[in-house]
Amino acid sequence: MKVTGNASRVVLLVLVLIGGMAQAQPDIERRVAELERKMKLLDPSFVPASELGVLERLQALEVRMDAALSAKAVAPPQQAQALQPVSIAGDFQKAADTETRLPVAGYMDFHVNKEAGDSFRPDFHRFVLLFGHSFSERIKFWSELELEHSLVEGGEESGEVALEQAYLDFLFTPKFNLRAGMLLTPVGIVNERHEPPSFNGVERPFVESIIIPTTWRELGFGFTGDLGRGFRYRTYLTSSLDASRFNAEFGIADGKTSGLDASMRNPAWAGRLEFAGIRRLTVGTSMYSGLAGFNAPGVNPRVTIANVDARYSIRRVDLRGLFANTWVSKAGELNRLLRQQTGVNPNVASQMRGYYFEPALHILPRRYRQDLIAFGRYERYNTQQKMPAGYLPLEQFNRSSWITGIAYKPAPDVALKFDYVFNRNQSAVVKALNGLNLGIGWWF
């Protein structure tokens, strides 16, 4: 693989930044203060854990913020308090005679991408608005409406308006609550928490876009809860994947229905268990299993996904890693059926695998109110890991990527990103192209 002079300078710049600022302390106190303020808006009973160190408080706050957003369906905008319906009784249900305004949140994802030998391509990838409402103390609503690529018109290359989430929470106890509607499938790290400032890199990790579908949502219902001692869970029955859309390059990723013509004839199960009972550490594991014979009459393959992941922070360093494996039963029968229907062999594998590891360093000294993060991520992902009998793997889809870059945060919820991607595959014929990415993202 050839590395251009520009790419070499990019890598050198990042290494110099990391080396030259190795003694700097991360600016996380402002982030902690901001999250504590938002948690107070979400939960008036919240009391900061002042006895913990700053990093421990940040870790605990991120976990509690995720739980609060899911349980209360109230967004954390800076002006959220002023937008809440007000009544003398303090009960949302009794505010019908007043002007009721919904809590509103949102995020934006603007990219400029360039592959080797190609020109720069700007794209307003995502603009998302989130709306929540409390019908009572025990019934909450939450939704996300997403516009992709800035414009919707006829044709396959146009943008898209999509319902990303829309569900009701029925809150019974901290350990047991009912959720129903359009749900994000709880597999991996990024699928449920994908606001641009929450992950490094302009684009989401390849493993969490291909081996695990990205923005994967399905219709369904299930249960959520906080079990105490650092454990929390989500378990859902959802609509199934569509195996007729599986292929060699993206595996099962194109099989998500996103609620359109979804099938519950053979509901799938998805579940996630997380543990954050150790300081600075969050560990999670997810499982998914469901039949996917949807539009493939005569063949009903089962898709099973297992993943483990972990996030750890120590002083100025953040570490993140994930492993995922996908199994597709009856892949050979599926390939033969789809070839009969379309004339093209999709070469769907019976097993797909991916993993990544990412260290990140907070560079700026604590006296600065901004944050500058240098990171590197190695990913290995193979959608042709194991083939059914009679099929050979396509080696161009046995891939690896090195991503190195920086993220500048002038405020905790605003990120300006730059990265360079070194792509490789195992094919001697099809060359993997390197890429350069610039991005701006925010959420409120």
Predicted features, each with a name:
Residues 91-243, 265-270, 274-282, 351, ...:
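Outer membrane beta-barrel
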Residues 22-109:
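N-terminal periplasmic/intermembrane-space "pro-region" immediately following the signal or transit peptide
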Residues 208-210, 257-260, 345:
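Active-site rim elements
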Residues 116, 155, 166-170, 191-193, ...:
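Outer-membrane beta-barrel pore domains
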Residues 197-205, 251-255, 336-340:
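Short glycine/proline- and charge-enriched loop/turn segments
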Residues 1-7:
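N-terminal secretory signal peptides that target proteins for export/translocation
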Residues 9-19:
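Bacterial N-terminal signal peptides
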Residues 245, 250-296:
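Loop-centered beta-sheet repeat module
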